[in-house]
Amino acid sequence: MKATIHEGHFATLPNGIRLHYASAGERGKPLLLFLHGFPEFWYAWYEQLQTFGTSYFAVAPDLRGFNLSDQPTNVSDYKPKLLTQDVEQLIAHLGYENCILVAHDWGGASAWNVAIGQPQLVERLI
């Protein structure tokens, strides 16, 4: 059985950035957060959302600068510290204290920074 994917969610974070995300599964189940690479967007995780949404609240955001998320024009708005902050704030926005974080490529750099800087937010890093 595959979970239904719900697109078109938006999270306005405390830092002012608005992120688009897709999700599958039910809130309340463990959060499985997928971070895409460059130059991708949430759809890179389509199959994983369908599969893992049966057991988790699976979420795949469009990272800052990609697809339907905010696309700041200043290069300085893409510093690793700010990209990491987006992930940290998204976890809280979704109502979770931690998550299983799955990432690759560009998203992997942010995932590592979250795990190192805020280890209490990451139950597992994949």
Where are these regions (language model features)?
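Conserved HGGG/HGGXW glycine-rich cap/lid loop of the alpha/beta-hydrolase fold
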Residues: 22-71, 90
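Alpha/beta-hydrolase fold catalytic core
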Residues: 1-32, 53-57, 96-97
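Glycine-rich, phosphate-binding/catalytic loops in enzymes
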Residues: 49-52, 75-78, 119-120
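Active-site loop/oxyanion-hole signature of alpha/beta-hydrolase fold enzymes
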Residues: 14-15, 22, 60-103
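Conserved hydrolase catalytic core segment
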Residues: 97-126
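Alpha-helical elements of Rossmann-like donor-binding domains used by nucleotide-donor carbohydrate transfer enzymes
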Residues: 6-8, 17, 44-47, 51, ...
